A protein has these predicted regions:
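Residue-centric detector for conserved, function-critical "anchor" positions
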Residues: 1-9, 14, 36, 298
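K/E-rich alpha-helical interaction surfaces of small helical-bundle regulatory domains
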Residues: 13-33, 52-55, 60, 264-282
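Mobile genetic element proteins and their domesticated derivatives, centered on retroelements
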Residues: 15-19, 26, 46, 62, ...
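Basic, flexible linker segments flanking DNA-binding modules
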Residues: 23-132, 229, 287-294
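RNase H-like two-metal-ion nuclease catalytic core shared by retroviral integrases
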Residues: 98-102, 200-202, 208-211, 224-244, ...
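Active-site beta-loop-alpha junctions of metal-dependent nucleic acid enzymes
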Residues: 146, 150, 169-191
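Short loop/turn microsegments at loop-to-beta-strand junctions
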Residues: 152-155, 166
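C-terminal domain-tail junction helix/linker
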Residues: 216-220, 242-298
Length: 298
């Protein structure tokens, strides 16, 4: 601001007259500049968080991170400062493609509550994805990652309580060995799973005898989505959507080989479990939330 820089050399009245600037406007601008200077620490912290998380965080998650760092700030201010600096979170791209089997299932959807509306003579189905503790409800699915060098398939297990990826397998083909390896890793990590509900869609691998037996031997109860209804497994679908939006869409051509893609997928899952905070988990990461609950003993 030229008037501010010259006021120490010349009378303010003369400078305001020459610049045709009202006194009230000058002091308003001066106050605004002073206010912006006070925001320097916050803005620097916002920039650090934004680039540390590779533009994956929007203003709400950045607000939670700032509060963790001791800043007293609300989401409205963070949104305003981010907008001023031109910092915007990655936005969802085209819907990802999730690999589906083509067999008919017979297992019931245990996450679906049937409510009869007698007054309006209709039946309403309400999905219930709430789990009060870890190892109460797990979900799984398979999703495809396609680049010029080929395809990789990700098969993870998601705990619906703390949204943690319990185990996963990355394979060049969606075969049962992939599913078996995923289960073995989860079962080695968690020993007491009796009564756990394990939900999936109607993919062919979840209808195999070997899959049924593996769950039954652990006392696990199987649940399956209704045919052709992806919303019945939306927590798992949402994870795939977040993952692809934050590390895959727009970056496909940066992966020169399947090995590079697999490393990026593994790094993201590690990041998701241990660094990426979730607003519904009170601003904690999945692992932090588990460690603060009884899940740590399971």
């Amino acid at each position: 601001m030229v008037v501010y820089e010259l006021q120490h050399k010349y009378p303010l009245v003369i400078l305001l007259n020459i610049s045709n600037l009202k006194k009230s406007t000058y002091y308003y601008t001066l106050k605004k500049l002073d206010k912006d200077t006070k925001n320097d620490d916050i803005m620097n912290a916002i920039i650090d968080i934004y680039y540390t998380h590779k533009a994956r965080y929007g203003y709400r998650r950045i607000t939670l991170e700032l509060i963790k760092r001791g800043f007293k700030v609300n989401h409205k201010k963070v949104k305003r400062l981010m907008s001023r600096m031109g910092l915007y979170a990655l936005t969802p791209k085209a819907k990802y493609k999730s690999y589906k089997g083509d067999m008919n299932g017979t297992v019931k959807n245990l996450l679906l509550n049937k409510v009869v509306d007698e007054e309006n003579h209709k039946t309403i189905y309400k999905r219930n994805f709430n789990a009060t503790s870890c190892n109460e409800i797990w979900s799984t699915d398979v999703s495809e990652f396609h680049i010029g060098a080929g395809k990789l398939y990700l098969s993870p297990i998601l705990d619906l309580h703390n949204r943690e990826i319990i185990s996963y397998n990355i394979s060049k083909s969606p075969n049962f060995e992939q599913t078996k390896d995923m289960l073995d890793k989860a079962f080695n990590k968690h020993k007491h799973l009796e009564g756990l509900i394990f939900h999936s869609d109607q993919g062919w691998q979840y209808q195999m005898y070997e899959y049924h037996k593996a769950l039954r031997d652990k006392g696990i109860i199987q649940s399956m989505s209704r045919k052709g209804n992806c919303l019945d497994n939306s927590p798992m679908e949402n994870f795939f959507g977040k993952m692809k939006n934050e590390m895959f869409y727009g970056f496909e051509y940066t992966f020169k080989s399947l090995d590079e893609l697999q490393k990026a997928m593994e790094d993201y899952i590690e990041y998701y479990n241990n660094q990426r905070i979730i607003t519904k988990l009170k601003g904690l990461t999945p692992v932090e939330y588990r460690n603060q609950s009884l899940c740590a003993n399971l």
